[in-house]
Amino acid sequence: MKKIIIGLGNPGKEFQNTYHNIGFLALESFLKNNKHQMIPNSYQGHLYQIQLNNCISFLVKPQMYMNSSGKVVKKILDAYQIKIEDILVILDDIYLPEGKIKLRPQGGHAGHNGLRNIIECCNTNKFKRLKIGVGYDSNIPLNQYLLTPFNLHQKKQILQNIDKIHEIMSKFIQGISFNNLMNQYNVIK
């Protein structure tokens, strides 16, 4: 059974080290540590194939802006005939403290425009999410906070659980029950 992991972010160097690109950062970090193959495609996304313990899956970095990510996701789901319940979306969450992680089996968009667009394009909210906390300083306008490059200390803070994030991604690809993953990783402080 093939799975897809989608890291949300915005294309372009100016967004590279911003809170809103945490999904891209998590995917890139995972790819550095695992053998993979880039798949040429016409879906407006970077598509990578990975095999872990005989489980073949795809990792996706949509190359449209965050608010249009759903178009890329829908095209890839249709092309590879992958069910919505077999995707995991990695995204930033302003409601979680920096670096904290939370798995959700489904839900609304909570104001996150990338999630909103995936829900609209796929016509469902029944897909799994790995939320990575980026906190939020309410003294700064939200767009500015999410799209301003962070410093090295902030990056370390955000990625403090990167090993756990990699474990979750690996176990998801290998078909470990999502309920088991939530029970194991949602308790991490």
Curated annotation (Swiss-Prot):
Site (Stabilizes the basic form of H active site to accept a proton): 92
Keywords: Cytoplasm, Hydrolase, RNA-binding, tRNA-binding
Keyword match RNA-binding: yes
Subunit organization: Monomer.
EC numbers, comma separated: 3.1.1.29
Recorded catalytic activity of this chain's protein: an N-acyl-L-alpha-aminoacyl-tRNA + H2O = an N-acyl-L-amino acid + a tRNA + H(+)
Functional summary from the UniProt entry: Hydrolyzes ribosome-free peptidyl-tRNAs (with 1 or more amino acids incorporated), which drop off the ribosome during protein synthesis, or as a result of ribosome stalling. Catalyzes the release of premature peptidyl moieties from peptidyl-tRNA molecules trapped in stalled 50S ribosomal subunits, and thus maintains levels of free tRNAs and 50S ribosomes.
Entries under SUPFAM superfamilies matching the protein: Peptidyl-tRNA hydrolase-like (SSF53178)
Pfam families, A to Z: Pept_tRNA_hydro
Assigned protein family: Belongs to the PTH family.
GO molecular function, one term: tRNA binding
Site residues (Discriminates between blocked and unblocked aminoacyl-tRNA), renumbered to this chain: 10
Superkingdom of this protein's organism: Bacteria
Binding residue positions for tRNA: 15, 65, 67, 113
Record-given protein name: Peptidyl-tRNA hydrolase
Location(s), subcellular: Cytoplasm
InterPro entries: Pept_tRNA_hydro (IPR001328), Pept_tRNA_hydro_CS (IPR018171), Pept_tRNA_hydro_sf (IPR036416)
Active site: 20 (proton acceptor)
GO cellular component: cytoplasm
Protein's GO biological process: protein quality control for misfolded or incompletely synthesized proteins; rescue of stalled ribosome
Keyword Protein biosynthesis among UniProt keywords: no
EC top class, as a word: hydrolase
